[in-house]
Amino acid sequence: MHFFSAIVLTCLASTAVAYPALEQAASSAEFKEYQKQEKRQTLGFDAASQIVSTTGDHAWQAPGANDIRGPCPGLNSMANHGYIPRNGYTSDAQIIAAMQAVFNISPDFGGFLTVLGSAMGGDGLGFSIGGPPSASLLTATGLVGKPQGMSNTHNRFESDQSITRDDLYQTGNDVTLNMNFFQDLLNSSLPKGWYDIDVLGNHAVKRFQYSVANNPYFFKGLNTAFIPEATSALVTYLFANHSAACPAGCLDATNLKSFYSVTGSGSTLKYTPGHERIPDNWYKYPVGYGVANVFADMVTVYSKYSNQAAFGGNTGTVNSFTGLDVANITGGVYNAETLLQGNNLGCFLFNGMEFFMPDLISNGGVIGDVSGVVSSLTGTITSLLAPFNCPKLSGIDKKAFAIYPGWNDGKPRK
């Protein structure tokens, strides 16, 4: 998670630009330069514990006609390798275990993501990684509606400014990979042939600016604001191969394409929805990636936004971005001047989510026991924030959100 002083992306070419050199392995000199520039300390290497199996029970299989796949490359790849059910419907316990087994996402952060995703797109006990599941897959009782899956969680879990997907209210499709956005990401690493946190952070900023310039309903609120920037960090560190040759983790075009279900090179790039794949001979992050990592990486990404407000949205026309006044909506507990200091950013975003949960879950129209799920979520957030000595936030002034037509209190899309 980071930010910027990037060039405004006014438009993307409709035809992918060919950069065949990007597909070639970096030279030894480039590799050493990459390692020198990589700020993250080498965390050690243990082949036996880090290798992720792609054989036997975890051999890649294309999804069947009735299998569900969605917008998240990590979830799709885990389903295609059988780390979560190949049908694309996972229980909370299954996904927490799988995220640790494949990506070494620690149970604290993995548990938070799971509980949040299950509440926003599932039945509170599990969820579809894509669209609505069949009734036979559901396990919860007391539901008042049909879960819509992770593909239908706009402004509740999924957000505008995805690094590879369109904004929902701009094109109506926030699930399928936009090859122009992906090509832009591929091209951005050309000078050194690798992808690091600066490359992904700068790409996130360009996507932010593209959304502002093209989506009149672009919105980036508190409850989803961490998603685009978290994605930048997760792709950088968790899609990288932490091998003996590069224990700090190196992410190249080959591995990036594998996780995003893209094949070919240059002008022959091809995206096949739902065919995401864990690369062979791939070693996961060496230690648990947890909330402390998320907080630190978010500051790295958000700092790239320089003086441009990172929260808020367009007010019904393109290029009408109006930022949220952090001090105003938090009663002065947080402010723009100190938001990137210490753990303030993480505390603000995670703590601020609590005040949106009742409406988001209720307006989802699925879970009957709203108070029970809210209690579970707030308890999880409280536990996560306990080590960070966060300032006490007593509420969020939601009236400030009324000017944003892209904000919908988490109501299902029509």
UniProtKB/Swiss-Prot annotation:
Residues of the signal peptide: 1-18
GO MF terms, alphabetically ordered: metal ion binding; peroxidase activity
Pfam families associated with the record: Peroxidase_2 (PF01328)
Pathway: Mycotoxin biosynthesis
Binding site for heme: 72
Cofactor comment: Binds 1 heme b (iron(II)-protoporphyrin IX) group.
Similarity field: Belongs to the chloroperoxidase family.
Stored InterPro entries: Chloroperoxidase, Chloroperoxidase-like_sf
Organism: Dothistroma septosporum (strain NZE10 / CBS 128990)
Function: Peroxidase; part of the fragmented gene cluster that mediates the biosynthesis of dothistromin (DOTH), a polyketide toxin very similar in structure to the aflatoxin precursor, versicolorin B. The first step of the pathway is the conversion of acetate to norsolorinic acid (NOR) and requires the fatty acid synthase subunits hexA and hexB, as well as the polyketide synthase pksA. PksA combines a hexanoyl starter unit and 7 malonyl-CoA extender units to synthesize the precursor NOR.
Cofactor(s) it depends on: heme b
Glycosylation site list: 187, 241, 328
Name this polypeptide is given: Dothistromin biosynthesis peroxidase dotB
UniProt entry keywords in alphabetical sequence: Glycoprotein, Heme, Iron, Metal-binding, Oxidoreductase, Peroxidase, Signal
Lineage per the UniProt record: Eukaryota, Fungi, Dikarya, Ascomycota, Pezizomycotina
Keyword Iron recorded: yes
E.C. code: 1.11.-.-
Induction notes from the record: Expression is positively regulated by the dothistromin-specific transcription factors aflR and aflJ. Dothistromin biosynthetic proteins are co-regulated, showing a high level of expression at ealy exponential phase with a subsequent decline in older cultures.
